């Protein structure tokens, strides 16, 4: 699999210029580039999407890609899977106004975000979280929001979302989150960085090496 590019959405406190970030980026890019099919060939070959008799398209699944990324990131790079940094509800509960009284009100928080897909802590103490996209575009938005909130509260200092390129998206399970559909919202997440003391939010874009019929 190819790593195409990493988009720095915001960088507060110079994290992107640190040796820690350089090592973290190299680590997960190695795991991206370890994903191949057929296994052992050193490149990722996928079947082109094909139209079925019912008019729907047959596409490649996404579970294999995440599993291969997980295997390398955990076993070779020594990250942790399904890890979290605790965010207290009191840290994110905000005061709003009720209409028409305009009284101050705190809406109860009845659910939390769950664990990140992958986490690690650098020798200097930077907490890092990665989300690997396997869901639809709504899932991508939730992942970005979760990373942004964790950065704002200081629970993590680096947050990364890994998503398919538009070309890869065409040949994967229908409606998976991808960079093209996220691109119009980057300005919103960028502005959230103004509230972060120290933190780096990144989207990394990945793609297949080859297509076959």
For every predicted segment, state its role.
Residues 155-165:
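Conserved beta-strand signature within the Rossmann-like core of class I S-adenosyl-L-methionine
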Residues 135-139, 166-169:
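Short acidic, S/G/P-rich loop/turn micro-motifs used as interaction or catalytic elements
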Residues 165-213:
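Domain-level recognition of nuclease-like catalytic cores that cleave nucleotide substrates
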Residues 1-86:
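Nuclease-adjacent, charged terminal/linker segments that flank catalytic cores
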Residues 51-60, 68-124, 136-145, 152:
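Active-site metal-binding core of divalent-cation-utilizing nuclease and nuclease-like domains
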Residues 150-156, 191-195:
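Arginine/glycine-rich "motif VI" loop of SF2 helicases in the C-terminal RecA-like domain
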Residues 126-128, 158:
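Structural motif
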């Amino acid at each position: 699999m190819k790593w195409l590019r990493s988009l720095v959405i915001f960088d507060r406190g110079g994290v992107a210029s640190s040796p820690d970030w350089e090592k973290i980026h190299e680590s997960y890019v190695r795991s991206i580039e370890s994903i191949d099919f057929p296994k052992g060939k050193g490149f990722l070959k996928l079947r082109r999407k094909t139209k079925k008799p019912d008019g729907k398209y047959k596409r490649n699944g996404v579970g294999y890609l995440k599993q291969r990324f997980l295997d390398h990131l955990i076993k070779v790079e020594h990250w942790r899977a399904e890890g979290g940094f605790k965010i207290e509800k009191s840290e994110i509960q905000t005061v709003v106004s009720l209409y028409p009284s305009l009284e101050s009100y705190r809406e109860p928080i009845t659910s939390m975000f769950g664990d990140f897909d992958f986490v690690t802590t650098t020798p200097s103490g930077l907490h890092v979280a990665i989300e690997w996209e396997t869901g639809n575009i709504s899932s991508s938005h939730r992942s970005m929001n979760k990373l942004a909130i964790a950065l704002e509260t200081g629970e993590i200092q680096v947050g990364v979302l890994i998503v398919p390129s538009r070309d890869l998206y065409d040949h994967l399970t229908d409606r998976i989150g991808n960079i093209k559909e996220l691109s119009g919202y980057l300005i919103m997440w960028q502005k959230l960085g103004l509230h972060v003391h120290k933190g780096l939010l990144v989207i990394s874009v990945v793609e297949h090496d080859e297509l076959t019929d």
